[in-house]
Amino acid sequence: MNNTEFHQLVDNELQLIEEAIDESGADIDYETTGNVMTLEFDDRSQIIINRQEPMQEIWLASKSGGFHFQYKAGQWICSKTGVEFAHMVKQECEKHAGESIDWA
C-alpha cells in the first residue's frame, strides 16, 4: 500500500474508535493532534495511539505496554498478540476505566 492509502485506512480506524467512544457513553476524553490520538480517563491515565508511516503500522501504548498493529487481510492485527486493533482498544479502555464499556 502507498502512504496515501495507509493514512486513509488509519483515519478510518481512528474515526471508528471516536464513534464507538461517543456512542458508548463512556467517560473517555480523546484528542487527535497530528499523527497521535490520546485517550484520557478519569484517573488521568492515558492510551496513546500513534501512526507510524515509515513502517505502515499503528502503535498503541497503555498500562499494559506497547503494541504494534499491521494491516493484514483487511484488519489491523497486533504483531505480538494477534488481536484486532479495535478489540484491543476496547480491552485497554476497560482496563483504564475500571469498568465494562458497551461498544459495538
From Swiss-Prot:
The protein's organism comes out as Vibrio vulnificus (strain YJ016)
Instruction: State the protein's purpose.
Output: Involved in iron-sulfur (Fe-S) cluster assembly. May act as a regulator of Fe-S biogenesis.
What broad taxonomic lineage does this protein's source fall under? Bacteria, Pseudomonadati, Pseudomonadota, Gammaproteobacteria, Vibrionales
Q: Name one Pfam family in it.
A: Frataxin_Cyay
InterPro entries per record: CyaY, Frataxin/CyaY, Frataxin/CyaY_sf, Frataxin_CS
Task: Supply the name of the protein.
Answer: Iron-sulfur cluster assembly protein CyaY
Name the domain of life. Answer: Bacteria
Where in the chain are disulfide-linked cysteines found?
none
The Gene Ontology CC terms held by the record are: cytosol
Q: Which PANTHER family match?
A: FRATAXIN, FRATAXIN, MITOCHONDRIAL
Per the record, the GO terms for biological process are: iron-sulfur cluster assembly
Q: Where is the signal peptide?
A: none
GO terms of molecular function? ferric iron binding; ferrous iron binding
Task: Name the UniProt key words of this record, in alphabetical order.
Answer: Iron, Metal-binding
Homology family: Belongs to the frataxin family.
